[in-house]
A protein has these predicted regions:
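Bacterial Sec-dependent N-terminal signal peptides
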Residues: 1-12
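N-terminal substrate-binding region of glycoside hydrolase catalytic domains
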Residues: 12-86, 94-121, 222
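Conserved, mostly hydrophobic/aromatic
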Residues: 18, 46, 90, 143, ...
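Active-site beta-loop-alpha junctions enriched in small/polar residues
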Residues: 21-23, 59-61, 92-96, 145-150, ...
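Aromatic-rich peripheral "rim/lid" segments of glycoside hydrolase catalytic domains that contact
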Residues: 31-34, 243, 264-295, 299, ...
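Active-site cleft segment of glycoside hydrolase catalytic domains centered on the general acid/base Glu
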Residues: 69-72, 99-212, 216-218, 230-239, ...
Length: 361
């Protein structure tokens, strides 16, 4: 059965989402968002435009920022739920960015040498976080156990595991997955679990090795897909998604992607997506950005995926500081034009289900 232009989750099982982790911080640092020249709450705007899933990163005890900790994430979940959007909570299991290049252990756990105690730390932290949100009636619909865990998790600061010790890695990841399972059983809830790998070519080998080492109890495979860092073209993407879906019998979601609408840098913070991120078929323009997103969603649907999330579409320039400078490293790839008072851009139309043909199960 094909449904045209419908996205009610539960009928078509498709998410069109946004990672809004930076919103609280940039608003506190002076950012104002506009739609048709009028000030607007960004959460209200995303919901109004039919965004149905908000992704939020959670750091353990960040020392470089007072955001993306549990208090900040709790506030963000409240904002998302108030607007009727579902939530994907992204546990980084780190005090800072966890990604393919670094998976640094939280400082509070850094002296733990006993693997069982370390695993229990993941379990208790995950479980207690969900208990906190449960008491506030703010449970996420999906929980991500780790962020871009291409390499081995919980490594000493400054070190990168060149080769994954799967006995250790599988035990630790399974403890996070088990915490969600046990929480669901106790509270009769149905929080879904996701594992997340950057780039489809890496997911193909990583999930094979994970499966061989006993990591099986999860519902979602999450992928980052940035053409700048992937060997796969957009046209090749459906094949990889189909392989992952059929081989492991999991739902698939692209949880990170982005495309620039300009190469102009509005502030002194360098922009991560430069001319090397451009694709010939998608101009570096507001319409080109929109075309990229709609094309990507259609390819994701073709591959059997059940969702696409844009990474940090509201990380506009502000007086906020990052580890690398003041401003935004993403201002040319947001859904707002910082050179025009943060006016909303045409790419918001990517949330419009009328752009897609959704196939139901």
């Amino acid at each position: 059965m094909i449904l045209f232009g419908s996205i009610l989750f539960g009928q078509t099982n498709f998410y069109l989402g946004a990672d809004l982790s930076y919103v609280n911080e940039v608003e506190d640092a002076g950012a104002i968002y506009r739609y048709q020249k009028k000030k607007i709450d960004p959460y209200q705007l995303f919901a109004q435009k039919k965004c149905n899933l908000v992704r939020l990163r959670l750091w353990h005890q960040p020392s470089h920022s007072s955001y993306s900790n549990l208090a900040d994430v709790t506030k963000s979940i409240q904002r998302a739920k108030k607007q009727g959007m579902q939530v994907l909570l992204d546990f980084h299991y780190s005090d800072t960015w966890a990604d393919p290049e670094k998976q640094y252990i939280p400082k509070a756990w850094s002296e733990i040498s006993d693997l069982k105690i370390l695993g229990d730390s993941i379990y208790q932290y995950t479980y207690k976080t969900l208990e906190h949100l449960f008491r506030l009636k703010l449970l996420p619909e999906i929980v991500q156990i780790g962020n871009e865990t291409n390499s081995e998790i919980l490594q000493p600061e400054g070190k990168h595991a060149e080769k994954i010790n799967w006995e250790r890695n599988a035990f630790l990841l399974n403890q996070g997955l088990l915490a969600v399972k046990d929480f669901n059983e106790k509270h009769q809830t149905n929080i879904q679990r996701m594992l997340h790998i950057a780039q489809p070519e890496n997911a193909l080998w990583w999930f094979e090795e994970a499966h061989q080492n006993g990591i099986e109890n999860y519902e979602w495979i999450g992928l980052s897909y940035y053409p700048l860092w992937s060997k796969y073209t957009m046209e090749q993407l459906p094949e990889a998604l189909s392989i992952l879906k059929e081989k492991y019998q999991k739902e698939i979601m692209i949880v990170e992607t982005a495309y620039p609408f300009t190469l102009t840098n509005i502030d002194k913070a360098n922009n991560i997506l430069n001319e090397k991120a451009l694709l010939p078929e998608f101009p570096c323009s507001p319409e080109g950005q929109k075309k990229y997103m709609i094309s990507l969603v259609n390819q994701a649907i073709k591959g059997g995926a059940k969702g696409v999330i844009y990474w940090e579409p509201a990380w506009v320039t502000s007086n906020a500081h990052t580890l690398w400078g003041r401003g935004s490293h993403w201002d040319n790839a947001t859904f707002f034009d910082s050179s025009n008072q943060n006016e909303a851009l045409p790419v918001f139309d990517f949330f419009n289900p009328k752009n897609y043909l959704f196939q139901t199960n």
